[in-house]
């Protein structure tokens, strides 16, 4: 697991106590996106890590994975593929259900987005429990692709997502981490 910690990235992320409920320390990356220098440092760190690594597709998970995955896709000249919540993609999809802290959710991917042999990089803003990214990995695998790496702006290691994804054989890049929930 690789960690890059430019201060500008970490310092641009706002922490909001007790949101969305008591006891949660919410890590708000919208303040990073509003800071051009921090956003550039974030994308540049991803570019440096993944340039010339042989990826054939970049997948961003809804919705902030789009914000970080699309510029990386552009910079590397690799197709960007969105993974969406149900009912948002217009063509035939493959679905994957996954568990949330209080219930279930589903992610979808166009059936023609990944072809057997694709080497896929997954991108999202934050890794907490790992449920969303695990569901995304399973979608890629259902279509015959190989998800080998996952990139996150923020990781919350105490919530177990890093261990969960590492057990699946995925290499993780986190730019910053925060303690607690």
Swiss-Prot record:
Pathway(s) this gene product operates in, as recorded in its UniProt entry: Purine metabolism; AMP biosynthesis via salvage pathway; AMP from adenine: step 1/1
GO MF annotation list: adenine phosphoribosyltransferase activity
Reactions this protein catalyses: AMP + diphosphate = 5-phospho-alpha-D-ribose 1-diphosphate + adenine
Keyword check for Nucleotide-binding: no
PROSITE patterns: PUR_PYR_PR_TRANSFER
Keywords: Cytoplasm, Glycosyltransferase, Purine salvage, Transferase
Subcellular location: Cytoplasm
InterPro entries cross-referenced by the UniProt entry: Ade_phspho_trans (IPR005764), Adenine_PRTase (IPR050120), PRibTrfase_dom (IPR000836), PRTase-like (IPR029057)
Assigned GO CC terms: cytosol
E.C. number: 2.4.2.7
Top-tier EC class: transferase
Classification via CDD domains: PRTases_typeI
One GO-annotated biological process of the protein: adenine salvage
Primary location recorded for the protein, binned into one broad class: cytoplasm
Function according to Swiss-Prot or TrEMBL: Catalyzes a salvage reaction resulting in the formation of AMP, that is energically less costly than de novo synthesis.
Subunit structure: Homodimer.
Family, as annotated: Belongs to the purine/pyrimidine phosphoribosyltransferase family.
NCBIfam families: apt, PRK02304.1-1, PRK02304.1-3, PRK02304.1-5
Name the UniProt record assigns to this protein: Adenine phosphoribosyltransferase
Gene name of this polypeptide: apt
